[in-house]
Amino acid sequence: MAKNGEGLLMSAIMMVVAAALIDREGRVLVQRRPVGKMMAGLWEFPGGKIEHGETPESALVRELDEELGITVDIARLAPAAFASEPLAGRHMLLLLYICRSWEGSPRALDAEELMWCTPDSLRALDMPPADRPLIGLLEAVLSSRGA
């Protein structure tokens, strides 16, 4: 851990991106984390870590291809919300983007399963702590934009 200018300990920040893929019916795609991974069985927005040299948007395009087999144009990603959460000795900063247009049909390439659900039904799902605050923020953004 590093110290900031005031001598306080700071943990390393892990930057993570995720997508709220919204279909024509206004449903959101979530995926269930596979067995063998941290937080296995929990539902999450698809995405992943930003690798060295990547922008958040290019990382998300890569992750959506790797995890779902879909192609997304960076111009179709709209920043929506973020969450901040301590995780395994680090601090995760999760950036959520809304995406309403992509090429291909999402497939569970890295997840146990996929599910389309309405934004209000997300609250009933078991989700990682960092994803939970994004639900209300996502609902607010979608309602202000007319879903």
Task: Label each region the model flagged.
Residues 96-98, 107-138:
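NUDIX/MutT-family hydrolases
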Residues 23, 81-105, 115:
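Active-site-adjacent beta-strand/loop module that shapes the phosphate/pyrophosphate-binding cleft
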Residues 4-28, 49, 82:
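Conserved N-terminal beta-strand and adjoining loop/helix that marks the start
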Residues 27-66:
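Conserved Nudix-box catalytic region and its N-terminal flanking loop in Nudix hydrolases
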Residues 139-147:
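Generic C-terminal helix-cap and adjacent flexible tail
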Residues 71-81:
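A short coil-to-beta-strand element that immediately follows conserved catalytic motifs
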